[in-house]
Amino acid sequence: RWGLENGFDYICEMDCDFSHNPDDLVRLYRAAAEGNDVVVGSRYVQGVNVVNWPMSRLLMSYFASKYVRIITGLPIHDTTAGFKCYRREVLETIGLDGIRFKGYAFQIEMKFTAYKCGFKIAEVPVIFVNRELGTSK
């Protein structure tokens, strides 16, 4: 909401524990500026690019994304990714007050709602590195 209220044309979301590399923001922005409405920093668009996750967590994440893709028809490989760049119009159109879920379901709902509204979604491959310090909320 802050990005919308302050007039930004592109709004990015990422983990702030450096699981997402800030250097990749440029690639997400470029893909959005080239005509994509939502750009996902994807762990799974080119194989599996996850470092230091237990195998059980990796398998659960990977197959959950496959399941969601089958059920929803979302044309992306990493449906639960939290590293994204939105064009302003997407967030204004989907109505953030109508988003109901939290956590991973929030990530899916945002992408699915944008997709159902006809927005173009693209993936950019990233390497996700599990945090070494801190905890998830």
Predicted regions located by residue number:
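DNA-recognition element of transcription regulators
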Residues: I108
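Acidic metal-phosphate-binding loop of nucleotide-sugar-dependent transferases
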Residues: F18-S19
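Catalytic donor-sugar/metal-binding loop of nucleotide-sugar-dependent glycosyltransferases
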Residues: P75, G98-K102, K111-V129
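Acceptor/aglycone-binding surface of glycosyltransferases and processive sugar-polymer synthases
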Residues: R1-G3, F8-Y10, P22-Y104, R131-K137
